């Protein structure tokens, strides 16, 4: 198979463009060691006082800040634990990592980051910084696996084809490939979301739907009509381009 992409190649979904996770900065929080925050009985006492209105306004603000720090810390720990497991044991993720390294890319825990995201994305890819996993939106280990596999397809495309992420056809093609190959559009996922009305073409409809939504987020895209047109133009070649896989496995 030629190294030339079958259309112009594309990019990411939990994305934002240009191949970037367009996540807004999370609200600024002070740098605090979570172990220094109230815990055990004292944290329970503060929680009860907060819920029953026995805190002053100043105490309530401090409690809400402490609670947010605790929640984000717990999210981060869970995301990091699942990330490490998936990168070590997921056949899809390990295969993609090997394929990326074969074409000169370098992907490891050092450029796959867990962080809090304000927009409703599961993750994103940036050609300079790597992969972002949105710790507050990834619901489970399997969801993280699908998200990481999706973004790794973008990473692969960017490394192999030198994608221009502001080119809507490039972006659309990689989005189609990422949704098709990552497993996020497999039948069970769609059934659980209640979106698989027609079993025979559910996978394709899912990949197309997700690609259109991602292209719509590209600053160079005018509206849904343009995104739909671009996705349709590259659909056949990009959906059938399963590199680096032999076929659609998930």
UniProtKB/Swiss-Prot annotation:
Keywords per UniProt: Hydrolase, Membrane, Metal-binding, Metalloprotease, Mitochondrion, Mitochondrion inner membrane, Protease
Active site (UniProt): 151
InterPro entries: Peptidase_M76_ATP23 (IPR019165)
Main location: mitochondrion
Compartmental location: Mitochondrion inner membrane
Keyword match Plastid: no
Ligand binding (a divalent metal cation): 150, 154
Record family assignment: Belongs to the peptidase M76 family.
Gene assigned in the entry: ATP23
MF (Gene Ontology): metal ion binding; metalloendopeptidase activity
PROSITE patterns: ZINC_PROTEASE
Function: Has a dual role in the assembly of mitochondrial ATPase. Acts as a protease that removes N-terminal residues of mitochondrial ATPase CF(0) subunit 6 at the intermembrane space side. Also involved in the correct assembly of the membrane-embedded ATPase CF(0) particle, probably mediating association of subunit 6 with the subunit 9 ring.
Keyword hit for Cell membrane: no
GO biological process, any: mitochondrial protein processing
Assigned GO CC terms: mitochondrial inner membrane
Membrane topology: Peripheral membrane protein
Name of this protein: Mitochondrial inner membrane protease ATP23
EC number(s) recorded for this UniProt protein: 3.4.24.-
Signal peptide range in chain numbering: none
């Amino acid at each position: 198979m030629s190294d030339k992409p079958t259309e112009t190649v594309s990019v990411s979904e939990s994305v934002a463009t240009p191949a970037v996770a367009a996540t807004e900065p999370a609200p600024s929080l002070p740098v605090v060691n979570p172990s220094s925050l109230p815990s055990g009985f004292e944290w329970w006492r503060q929680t009860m006082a907060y819920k029953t209105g026995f805190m002053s306004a100043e105490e309530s603000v401090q409690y809400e800040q402490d609670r947010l720090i605790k929640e984000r810390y717990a999210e981060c720990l869970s995301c990091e634990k699942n990330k490490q497991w998936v990168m070590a044991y997921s056949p899809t993720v390990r295969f993609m990592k090997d394929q990326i390294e074969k074409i000169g890319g370098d992907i490891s825990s050092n450029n796959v980051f867990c962080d809090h995201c304000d927009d409703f994305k599961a993750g994103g890819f940036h050609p300079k910084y790597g992969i972002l996993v949105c710790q507050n939106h990834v619901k489970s280990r399997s969801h993280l696996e699908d998200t990481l596999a999706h973004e790794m397809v973008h990473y692969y495309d960017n490394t192999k084809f030198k994608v221009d992420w502001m080119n809507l056809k490039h972006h659309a093609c990689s989005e189609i490939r990422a949704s098709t190959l990552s497993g996020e559009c497999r039948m069970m996922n769609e059934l659980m979301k209640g979106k698989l009305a027609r079993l025979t073409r559910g996978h394709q409809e899912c990949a197309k739907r997700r690609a259109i939504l991602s292209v719509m987020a590209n600053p160079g895209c005018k509206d849904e009509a343009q995104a739909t047109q671009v996705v349709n133009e590259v659909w056949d070649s990009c959906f059938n381009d399963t590199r680096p896989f032999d076929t659609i496995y998930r």
